[in-house]
């Protein structure tokens, strides 16, 4: 999620510090350049411009337009908010309008409700123990900090423009696509094309998951990373064992 633009920014601004880079769901040269950089890459067969000008990034515009209202229903009930958001991938939604594309039209998150609705825990993505940790942290600190990522697009774009080597990444790069990730939709749209143009040693793999890939399919994610390390980064992995 928002960790991905941070990782991409480290690699693009400090390539001599990065032997290789692996990332999930959010492709390079997209959100770290601001959501406006993603708009030309939308699948307009799903999101006609006259009806969905911001496509599935509509929710990010909502944060900019009314930040306090965007976080209010999450702060009102962190438990429900986390359970609503933390859901496994939905194969049946491919090619359909995703819920994040209508947030402003719907009057805000959760249809403009004062708080998130009650849903059963999706144990495929989140355990009761994990839920308790997240709820405790967000009850204590609120959603202001995490959601403030959405208020920094302009500065992120300015920083991204300072990347060295024109933003090219020449180290080995692994990118894992979520087949059912309809926020960072890379299967049918052009969202990953800038990454493909800028990464000279790119490996892509598709995982049958939604947006919360690492939680939903941890075995598949770890297997993909290990295989890539052993094949694309074999000069440093595995580390040589010390002589007895």
Language-model segments: what does each one mean?
Residues 1:
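Catalytic nucleophile serine of serine hydrolases
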Residues 4-202:
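Flexible "cap/lid" subdomain of the alpha/beta-hydrolase fold that forms the substrate-access gate
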Residues 199-244:
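Catalytic active-site module of serine/aspartate enzymes centered on a nucleophile-bearing elbow/loop
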């Amino acid at each position: 999620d928002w960790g991905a633009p941070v990782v991409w920014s480290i690699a693009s601004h400090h390539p001599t510090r990065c032997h290789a880079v692996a990332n999930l769901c959010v492709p390079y040269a997209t959100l770290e350049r601001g959501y406006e950089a993603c708009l030309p890459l939308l699948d307009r067969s799903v999101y006609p411009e006259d009806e969905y000008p911001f496509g599935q990034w509509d929710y990010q515009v909502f944060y900019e337009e009314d930040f306090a209202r965007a976080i209010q229903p999450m702060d009102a009930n962190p438990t429900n908010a986390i359970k609503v958001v933390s859901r496994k991938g939905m194969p049946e939604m491919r090619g359909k309008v995703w819920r994040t594309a209508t947030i402003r039209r719907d009057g805000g998150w959760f249809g403009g409700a004062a708080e998130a609705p009650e849903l059963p825990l999706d144990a495929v993505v989140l355990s009761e123990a994990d839920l308790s940790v997240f709820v405790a942290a967000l009850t204590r600190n609120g959603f202001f900090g995490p959601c403030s990522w959405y208020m920094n697009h302009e500065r992120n774009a300015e920083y991204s423009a300072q990347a060295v080597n024109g933003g090219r990444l020449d180290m080995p790069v692994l990118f894992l696509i979520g087949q059912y990730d309809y926020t960072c939709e890379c299967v049918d749209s052009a969202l990953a094309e800038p990454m493909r143009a800028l990464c000279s040693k790119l490996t892509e793999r598709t995982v049958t998951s939604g947006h919360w890939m690492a939680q939903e399919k941890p075995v598949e994610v770890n297997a993909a990373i290990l295989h890539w390390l052993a094949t694309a980064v074999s000069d440093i992995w595995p580390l040589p064992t010390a002589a007895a």
